[in-house]
Amino acid sequence: FSSVPVHWHEEMEFIVVKKGRGLVTLDRESRLLEAGQAVIVLPGQLHGIRQYQQERMEYENIIFRLEMLLPKEGDVCGPKFLEPYRDGKLLYPAWIDGSALYHEEMLECIRKMDELSEQRPRGYPLAVKGWLFQFFFLMFSRVEPTLAEEGREKSLDKMKRILRRIEVDYGKPLSIEEMAEFSGFSESHFMKFFKNHMGVPFVSYLNDYRLTLAARALAEGQEDVLTVAMDVG
């Protein structure tokens, strides 16, 4: 792969590197991750993956809704631990890179879930949930959380609106002038805002996004080159 453009979704995600190395972006921070390392992506968090130089990387995504661990009533796990974490009110380290002793224990939880999902023994969803609870127990019990910064959420929400507009209208001409007006910024402020959040200029991101979708469509072989080119603008 060359890249997975920065995007967001409502599900939680673990990105786990299996082989090689690659650059992973989480909100405004990018890190070089290698085999045996991972990152935790919260619902609504901006994230993406890029190739590092000419190196190859194999990774897997574990995507799930945290609500599967939240009972409707009569349980302290949700309101005391999981909900504040999901909503970004309490911040825990997202990078599982071996810098802490408990990282290996957390990666072992991911490996166990991976094995269960491949083998699928009877009742395996129960065990998967059990390992998810163990994963979060390790994190909550070993790390003191920090409070979210004021103003950070508004900035990220605006960036997510911009990305959603690109996802919907990438096949149309999208000018800096139009996107600046959509965002409520001047053109110069929009360009600065976008690059500060994404690490690349708007036009570069839009072109990369279109190329990524075109490559995916061609790989699936459902349409010819001309049709794909017209679809992605």
Regions found by a protein language model. Give the residues of each.
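Regular secondary-structure segments
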Residues: K18, L107-E118, L163, E167-Y170, ...
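A hydrophobic/aromatic-rich effector-binding and dimerization subdomain
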Residues: F1, L46-E115
